[in-house]
Amino acid sequence: MAPLPLCFVTSSKKKLAEFLHAVGDNTIAHVSMDLPELQGDPETVAREKARAASRIYGGPVLVEDVSLCFNAYKGLPGVYVKSFLTAVGPSGLCNMLLPYEDKSAYALCIYAFCDVTVDDKPALFTGRADGRIVPPRGPQTFGWDCIFEPLEGGGKTYAEMEMVEKSAISHRGKALEKVKAFLTNSGVKVPCVK
């Protein structure tokens, strides 16, 4: 049986859109898979998600895990940002920092590549964007984009940017550049990578 092509695993349509924008529309297989929300540091969470997804898919996968880290909270909500967003929304996240002068934060994206048919040691590709938390601005259509103003963003939140502008400076865009370099040089069966 021929090896399976690389599959990007996500249940988020917005993450998928940004991923396909970066690597080329419809060039990599993708599947929606609800993986368990794990606890731990960002690297451990990404590794375990990749292993689990590769076991289910039966071949090479790429998964993404994102953290939003408030410096005033020593890195929280971090990998738990999805749970915080579900509970309190973007405004609630922003309000967590009301008692603090320090509104600085960083966004962290980790892509993990794993193929359990070869080995179970995921390769990690990390991107980070420093910025600050601001009251919601722009469309509230993708997670916490409307409250994160990256230092490189010219005073705009991610939500106020076009995808091309955001991808050039975002945590996800920085991590994806590393993923593209890896895929270009790895020999992994990928139909096409821009």
Curated annotation (Swiss-Prot):
Give the GO terms filed under biological process for this record. deoxyribonucleoside triphosphate catabolic process; nucleotide metabolic process
How is this protein named in the record? Inosine triphosphate pyrophosphatase
- Pfam families cross-referenced by the UniProt entry: Ham1p_like (PF01725)
Regarding protein family, the annotation reads:
Belongs to the HAM1 NTPase family.
Enzyme Commission number(s) of this protein: 3.6.1.66
**Catalyzed reaction equations:** ITP + H2O = IMP + diphosphate + H(+); dITP + H2O = dIMP + diphosphate + H(+); XTP + H2O = XMP + diphosphate + H(+)
* Species per Swiss-Prot/TrEMBL record: Giardia intestinalis (strain ATCC 50803 / WB clone C6) (Giardia lamblia)
Recorded GO cellular component terms are:
cytoplasm
**Is this entry keyworded Magnesium?**
yes
Subcellular location as annotated? Cytoplasm
Residues binding ITP are 10-15, 49, 65-66, 82, 142-145, 166, 171-172
- List residues binding Mg(2+): 37
Q: What does the protein in this record do? A: Pyrophosphatase that hydrolyzes non-canonical purine nucleotides such as inosine triphosphate (ITP), deoxyinosine triphosphate (dITP) or xanthosine 5'-triphosphate (XTP) to their respective monophosphate derivatives. The enzyme does not distinguish between the deoxy- and ribose forms. Probably excludes non-canonical purines from RNA and DNA precursor pools, thus preventing their incorporation into RNA and DNA and avoiding chromosomal lesions.
Task: Give me the disulphide-bonded residues.
Answer: none
